[in-house]
């Protein structure tokens, strides 16, 4: 048996806390103004009508309403856009 730990065991053993990213309000849901719709890193989903974008790319509702997702084609890339329609 080895009398010393392998070097791998001292280099491993760390993990970062989860950032809880993702969709917080899905299509068809009612939301209030200021509600967070999506937490994301980068703009994988673009803001549409009545949706604001925070400095960390978080998308939030500007008005009370219903969440809509749509797919848009932009320069050979399919992108998603989220908007809030007045209800």
Swiss-Prot record:
Signal peptide: none annotated. Disulfide bonds: none annotated. It comes from Prochlorococcus marinus (strain SARG / CCMP1375 / SS120). It comes from the Bacteria. NCBIfam families: L27. Residues 1-26 are annotated as: Disordered. This is Large ribosomal subunit protein bL27. GO terms for biological process: translation. One of its GO terms (cellular component) is cytosolic large ribosomal subunit.
